Amino acid sequence: MAKLSQDDLLAQFEEMTLIELSEFVKAFEEKFDVTAAAAVAVAGPAAGGAPAEAEAEQDEFDVILTGAGEKKIQVIKVVRELTSLGLKEAKDLVDGTPKPVLEKVAKEAAEKAAESLKAAGASVEVK
């Protein structure tokens, strides 16, 4: 098997959907017995610090479709790209708003998905 360069790999990843990338990461973690969680530096409490202000930053987000707008067909296409849903399931999701499109995804992935849906004319919330 030919060895792929980093640029070749990145080009392949750019062509994948978020769902495909998520499945790839899971398979990679299982194959090599690693986790993709980022290392988090742990800091001690601040001297004279504010009590109970150590609420962790949210790391999982839901992308909620709140309305399809006037370009419903475009929104259905984007929903299908973001998920592994078929045409009927994607249409039902768009028709039944408000509904979650993606659940428990990273902030960056949620923002990208929201941008794609907004560009197609949908109204979206990221929670």
Swiss-Prot record:
The keyword NADP does not apply. The keyword Ribonucleoprotein applies. One of its GO terms (cellular component) is cytosolic large ribosomal subunit. Gene3D superfamilies: 3.30.1390.10, Single helix bin. It comes from the Bacteria. GO terms for molecular function: mRNA binding; structural constituent of ribosome. Keywords: Ribonucleoprotein, Ribosomal protein. GO terms for biological process: translation. Forms part of the ribosomal stalk which helps the ribosome interact with GTP-bound translation factors. Is thus essential for accurate translation. Belongs to the bacterial ribosomal protein bL12 family. Homodimer. Part of the ribosomal stalk of the 50S ribosomal subunit. Forms a multimeric L10(L12)X complex, where L10 forms an elongated spine to which 2 to 4 L12 dimers bind in a sequential fashion. Binds GTP-bound translation factors. This is Large ribosomal subunit protein bL12. The gene is rplL.
